[in-house]
A protein has these predicted regions:
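A detector for short, charged/polar N-terminal pre-domain segments
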Residues: 1-12
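Short amphipathic helical patch at the helix-1/turn junction of helix-turn-helix
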Residues: 11, 22-23, 53
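Short basic helix-loop element that most often maps to the first helix and adjoining turn
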Residues: 15-34
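Conserved hydrophobic/aromatic packing and binding residues within compact polymer-binding modules
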Residues: 17, 31-32, 42-45, 73
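Recognition helix of helix-turn-helix/homeodomain-like DNA-binding domains
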Residues: 36-52
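Short, basic-rich loop-to-helix N-cap that marks the start of a DNA-contacting helix
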Residues: 49-64
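Short C-terminal boundary/hinge segments that cap the last helix of small helical domains
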Residues: 67-77
Length: 77
């Protein structure tokens, strides 16, 4: 687990990525290849029990590939 002040937000980010990935019909392996990330790292990012951070640039890349706004991935309602 990462040492962070924002565990809830990072967990929700991962869940949002997983939701939009599935809506696009992509597997973790496919998305990981498209964003130049290992499948293991993506899996950790999406896992509800994991707290994994990513760079802002990577967030923009994921949003672009999933055809959503970065704000959609950062929606914590």
């Amino acid at each position: 687990m990462s040492n962070t002040n924002y565990p809830r937000q990072l967990q929700q980010l991962g869940l949002n990525i997983a939701r939009y990935r599935k809506l696009c019909g992509l597997t973790q392996e496919e998305l990981a290849a498209l964003i130049s990330m290992s499948r293991t790292h993506l899996s950790n990012l999406e896992a509800p029990g994991q707290i994994t951070s990513i760079s802002l640039e990577k967030l923009f890349t994921i949003a672009d590939v999933l055809n959503v706004s970065p704000a959609s991935l950062l929606s914590f309602d």
